[in-house]
Amino acid sequence: MSDTEDLAALNDRLMAKNHALAEALSRAGKELTKAKSQLAQLAQPPLTFATMVKVDSTRTDEDGIQHASAEVISGTRRMVVPVASNVNAARLTAGATVMLNEKLVLVEQRDADTVGQIRSVKQVLDDGRLIVTDASGNPVLIRRSGALAYAGINQGDRIIVDPSVRLAIEALPAEGDKDLVLEETPDVTFADIGGLDSEIGRIRDAVQLPFQHRALFERYDLKPPKGVLLYGPPGNGKTMIAKAVANALCEGGYDTNGDGSISPAETHVKGVFLSVKGPELLNKYVGESERLIRLIFQRARERAADGNPVVVFIDEMDSLLRTRGSGVSSDVETTIVPQFLSELDGVESLDNVMVIGASNRVDMIDPAVLRPGRLDVKIRVGRPKTNQAIAIVDHYLTDDLPLEDGVDAHALSAVLVHDIYGTSERRHLCDVQEENGQWHALFLADVVSGAMLKNIVDRAKTRAVKESIETGLDVALTVPLLAAAVEDEYRETRDSMADVDPEQWSRINGMDPIRRIRTAE
């Protein structure tokens, strides 16, 4: 190989190396630039979050450069800071989140924070400011953010406030209170209730007549009752009656004259049923229970403003309105009862609003609640007698069920009830000693309730279903099957009597005070 060829080959190798070195140098330059960028990012000082309050000042110089300052709150510090020239001061809104650099210059605006402390609105002032309270009832005066400047905010609404509790950032729906008050139309009708014809007649007279015959009530200058109390032992239909009343009102009717003709106004009456979860109104924070009671009646007045009847149903009323000074609770009732009474017959009228309460312990309700003019009508829903029990069982034992050949449902109901109401030793639960020291026998019939009757029928049906599964055939409901269900209920009730507190048990079940219980062997 000649020298020329050697030189050419060397030149090619050097050019290849030079090209490789150039590429390596280019890659190194890019990596160096990337590293510098990363170092610059790591060396960038942190930005501080703050809440925008208002623009403090703004002007534009002869060169068109903006010079502005803004009032912000960072943590608990209230400051006036300069605004960067590239941030449009005219677009800064109260309540928005802004960013401050290390020199406390406002360099960026972001959307308002969607999380924060929640407060309840106690009062809306004429200038739009709000008095809000925390869970302990401590009041604070705050301003609205730009997003809430023209929002309709009412007493009792919930809002999110900024960390300094100076600005209302966002309004929230009052979902917590809606959980306590259920606005519904129950599916229970009076036809679904057996054995309570007298009680149903009384409550229909008290609740339905005033709303469906308003012209007659006005003609006789008769005002409808403000409230109805359903009381008596548990499981006998108090809540079902209230639901049936609500169903009847919600279905609506026409305001009629005395002769049954529709009044000239042809007013269509359609009611609203507000079901209040009584025990859930109790709150450990002072004033919170009273606020919830005010909200309940406020909602009732709003629904009744158009002339439609509103029923406020309070179940377990004794848990909410206990006798003041009784010493059987934490004395929270000393403020709850007056608040309830002031809503019931205070300055603001309760036209078209009726309160229906249900309780197993009427002896624990404050007497001021029970006096005439408040809960005017008091209806005792007691334990069913024999004929009433048969009417109740007839609702659950019907002819469309698989029955024993040659026996109709009503006959089975009668056999079942007579077995339950027997006073032989086989239905003897226990012996009880009254306060006068006398002992007497207690039978299953003495503690029977509508709920127990339904439970016995359900036991028999469950037995029939299980036997049908085993045999593959429809097993009929027979007298022996019903008798076995009664026996099961009797044994469970008898066994439970050994563990009850005699005094409390007798009061809850509407009996005379009992000192001791001696169970049957």
Swiss-Prot record:
Keywords: ATP-binding, Coiled coil, Nucleotide-binding. GO terms for biological process: modification-dependent protein catabolic process; proteasomal protein catabolic process. InterPro entries: AAA+_ATPase, AAA_ATPase_domain, ATPase_AAA_core, ATPase_AAA_CS, NA-bd_OB-fold, P-loop_NTPase, Prot_ATP_ID_OB_2nd, Prot_ATP_ID_OB_N. GO terms for molecular function: ATP binding; ATP hydrolysis activity. GO terms for cellular component: proteasome complex. Residues 4-44 form a coiled coil. Transmembrane segments: none annotated. Disulfide bonds: none annotated. ATP binds at residues 235-240. NCBIfam families: pup_AAA. Homohexamer. Assembles into a hexameric ring structure. Belongs to the AAA ATPase family. This is AAA ATPase forming ring-shaped complexes. It comes from Bifidobacterium longum (strain NCC 2705).
